[in-house]
């Protein structure tokens, strides 16, 4: 999902400029939910779709959200925090997919500019398969593959930039559990994969020319 990642992150980054942030406003599910980000029930949320698929995103009570999509485009959305930290994140729910998709803790840092994923579940594409293998880390009942890649002149939260992409990809897939982000951050740092000042950090559902649906609850705020 190499091209998918860069396309999505650019669009998510752009939402702050393209759409006024919403505060404590529930999105109404429709054929294509408008792009946006903001806070809802104290949780940060972000949603973006390229409009190529029938896709809906709905903020629910507390840290819950739901998303459903049809084939034909790119989309990503979820709830969490802004800024991110080395917190332990607990999430639960259902995640159904047919094709290329992720369920992941997803975030960005600046100085250095880094896009990161802790992938908990994925569809037909393992994102670590086309990145530099950096070993493994065991956390929360599973081994995770660690990988790193360089995105050259790609869209980012700060416009078109060259930046690093960090991955931890869980081998025992799941759709509910706890993620100790400190374990992953420490493992990355031990391999020279350093982070900077945190921007947002969400439990995200992504789809790329696939179909699926998810109902996820995150332990935010």
Curated annotation (Swiss-Prot):
<dbReference type="InterPro" id="IPR001137">
    <property type="entry name" value="Glyco_hydro_11"/>
</dbReference>
<comment type="pathway">
    <text>Glycan degradation; xylan degradation.</text>
</comment>
<dbReference type="GO" id="GO:0045493">
    <property type="term" value="P:xylan catabolic process"/>
</dbReference>
<keyword id="KW-0624">Polysaccharide degradation</keyword>
<dbReference type="Pfam" id="PF00457">
    <property type="entry name" value="Glyco_hydro_11"/>
</dbReference>
<comment type="similarity">
    <text>Belongs to the glycosyl hydrolase 11 (cellulase G) family.</text>
</comment>
<protein>
    <recommendedName>
        <fullName>Endo-1,4-beta-xylanase I</fullName>
        <ecNumber>3.2.1.8</ecNumber>
    </recommendedName>
</protein>
<feature type="signal peptide">
    <location>
        <begin position="1"/>
        <end position="30"/>
    </location>
</feature>
<feature type="region of interest" description="Disordered">
    <location>
        <begin position="126"/>
        <end position="157"/>
    </location>
</feature>
<keyword id="KW-0732">Signal</keyword>
<keyword id="KW-0326">Glycosidase</keyword>
<dbReference type="GO" id="GO:0031176">
    <property type="term" value="F:endo-1,4-beta-xylanase activity"/>
</dbReference>
<dbReference type="GO" id="GO:0005576">
    <property type="term" value="C:extracellular region"/>
</dbReference>
<feature type="active site" description="Nucleophile">
    <location>
        <position position="115"/>
    </location>
</feature>
<dbReference type="InterPro" id="IPR013319">
    <property type="entry name" value="GH11/12"/>
</dbReference>
<dbReference type="InterPro" id="IPR018208">
    <property type="entry name" value="GH11_AS_1"/>
</dbReference>
<dbReference type="InterPro" id="IPR013320">
    <property type="entry name" value="ConA-like_dom_sf"/>
</dbReference>
<keyword id="KW-0964">Secreted</keyword>
<dbReference type="InterPro" id="IPR033119">
    <property type="entry name" value="GH11_AS_2"/>
</dbReference>
<feature type="active site" description="Proton donor">
    <location>
        <position position="206"/>
    </location>
</feature>
<keyword id="KW-0858">Xylan degradation</keyword>
<keyword id="KW-0378">Hydrolase</keyword>
<comment type="function">
    <text>Major xylan-degrading enzyme. Contributes to the hydrolysis of arabinoxylan, the major component of maize cell-walls.</text>
</comment>
<dbReference type="InterPro" id="IPR033123">
    <property type="entry name" value="GH11_dom"/>
</dbReference>
<feature type="domain" description="GH11">
    <location>
        <begin position="31"/>
        <end position="219"/>
    </location>
</feature>
<keyword id="KW-0119">Carbohydrate metabolism</keyword>
